[in-house]
UniProtKB/Swiss-Prot annotation:
Belongs to the complex I NdhN subunit family. Signal peptide: none annotated. This is NAD(P)H-quinone oxidoreductase subunit N. The keyword Lipid biosynthesis does not apply. NDH-1 shuttles electrons from an unknown electron donor, via FMN and iron-sulfur (Fe-S) centers, to quinones in the respiratory and/or the photosynthetic chain. The immediate electron acceptor for the enzyme in this species is believed to be plastoquinone. Couples the redox reaction to proton translocation, and thus conserves the redox energy in a proton gradient. Cyanobacterial NDH-1 also plays a role in inorganic carbon-concentration. It is an enzyme of class 7 (translocase). It comes from Prochlorococcus marinus (strain AS9601).
Length: 158
């Protein structure tokens, strides 16, 4: 493990590709170093888990409804057969409050995402010029990353 990870190559690859798949050693440490380097370069960062993400575009960017868990017999007259739907603010809403900064969304446990969900993450990056996304796709013996589009081609097309 190098003592100094400048993050220059990572920053350049992130700027050119906008969406990266990263493979980090399981003992950790690299992620926080890279996040700290990106914050120093002017990025506003947000880290979250990819588990339970559902539709990434709606869950991350738009106001959406979530039904609370069913707790047994309830009155059907008030809410109908569908139940009560509570509105939830987008998970990454604090990222989008500032329009002047570059934004970095870091998704942990990205290996649970399907091909279509990964493709929608790439589409989100292309629609928003200031948004970049890093998806952790699993462990590796050394820190590696590649464009998410290349990862999809390698992983799902073979």
């Amino acid at each position: 493990m190098p003592l100094l990870l400048s993050g220059k190559k990572f920053h350049n690859d992130l700027k050119t590709n906008k969406c990266l798949a990263i493979f980090a050693p399981l003992e950790g440490g690299y992620e926080t170093r890279l996040l700290r380097r990106m914050r120093a370069k002017g990025f506003k960062t947000f880290i979250t888990s990819a588990r339970g993400l559902g539709d990434p575009e709606v869950f991350l960017l738009k106001l959406h409804g979530v039904r609370p868990p069913h707790l047994g017999h309830q009155s059907v007259g008030r809410n109908g057969a569908l139940g009560e739907v509570q509105q939830v603010i987008p998970q990454a809403s604090e990222l989008f409050n500032e329009n002047d900064k570059n934004k970095l969304l870091w998704l942990l446990e990205g290996q649970v995402l399907s091909q279509s969900e990964l493709e929608s993450l790439i589409e989100i990056c292309t629609n928003d010029n200031k948004l970049t996304i890093v998806v952790e796709m699993g462990g590796s013996r050394k820190l590696e990353w590649k464009p998410l589009s290349n990862y999809i081609l390698d992983e799902f097309e073979s």
